[in-house]
Regions:
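ATP-binding pocket architecture of kinase catalytic cores
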Residues: 1-76, 81-82, 88-91, 95-98
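Conserved active-site beta-strand element of glycosyltransferases/polysaccharide synthases
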Residues: 33-34, 143-144, 153
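An alpha-helical support segment within catalytic cores of ATP-dependent transferases
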Residues: 66-127, 138-139, 229
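ATP/Mg2+ or Mg2+-diphosphate-binding catalytic cores
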Residues: 87, 91-95, 99, 206-244
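Pre-DFG segment of protein kinase catalytic domains
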Residues: 124, 143-146
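Active-site activation/catalytic loop segments of kinase-like enzymes and analogous catalytic loops
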Residues: 156-185, 198-217, 231
Length: 244
């Protein structure tokens, strides 16, 4: 968590209208917020309208010009930090999950190179996008909340964060990707966005390891993130011509 990045993004979110709950925030993390009357979590599986608005919010965010206070959020580097912290109580996790770590370390440079080829740079990202962080009020107004993980990242991470934390079918995943991009993806785009799912999953898998190491419930993120990491990592590597 980087409070400078969070502060910048939270105020930007207020300005561009994707989190109208904000009144004031300070560097220490204290916030004054409007009370959101009868707030509920969005349900993207049941509401195409909510999903469409949620994806539009991400595009608005990604168009914000960040200042020098916003730090880079590197999924793989940050994930390995959490894994190392968790190793203090869980044993040598780098060794236990050496195969997955090695594959992610091979995949990420390929994804970055593909992003450059496709013209995708680092943008302001939320980095913790999933249904519980999208609220709607009694009038249907949607709020994207919880900006603690904000940082510069590839826009694909903000859709990858959603896709890696649920056990969705290929058809469900395609619905989210098509809504995010706004059309049917090209073959190159599809390879890139699918390959980002295990990159996003790796961070939340490591986050789950960390939460478990400090006695918190780790199952909500750990299990689906782990399953999606395993499900997509080999497929992604093979899509870039990498074999076992």
């Amino acid at each position: 968590i980087d409070r400078q990045s969070e502060l910048f993004a939270q105020l930007a979110a207020k300005k561009i209208g994707i989190d109208k709950s904000v009144i004031h925030m300070e560097m220490a993390g204290w916030k004054i917020l409007h009370y959101v009357q009868n707030a509920k979590n969005c349900n993207f599986e049941k509401s195409n309208e909510q999903l469409t608005v949620a994806m539009k919010y991400l595009h608005r965010l990604h168009e914000v010009e960040p200042d020098e206070s916003v730090k880079i959020f590197d999924n793989v580097a940050e994930g390995k930090k959490l894994m190392d912290i968790a190793s203090a109580t869980k044993g040598n996790l780098r060794k236990e999950f050496a195969d997955l770590v090695e594959k992610v370390e091979r995949l990420y440079p390929l994804v970055k190179a593909d992003a450059k080829r496709l013209g995708y740079g680092l943008v302001l990202c939320h980095n913790d996008t999933y249904e519980p962080n999208y609220l709607y009020d009694e009038k249907g107004e949607i709020y994207l909340i919880d900006w603690e993980y904000t940082g510069l990242n590839y826009a694909a991470n903000d859709i990858g964060c959603i896709l890696c934390r649920y056990d969705w079918s290929d058809e469900q995943i395609e619905r989210y990707l098509k809504t995010f991009v706004g059309r049917t993806l090209t073959e190159d785009e599809h390879r890139y966005y699918i390959a980002f799912i295990p990159i996003s999953a790796f961070y939340w898998f490591c986050w789950g390891l960390y939460k478990g190491s400090v006695g918190d419930d780790d199952s909500f993120f750990f299990l689906p993130s782990y399953r999606n990491l395993v499900r997509f990592i080999d497929f992604a590597l093979e899509s870039y011509g990498e074999k076992e």
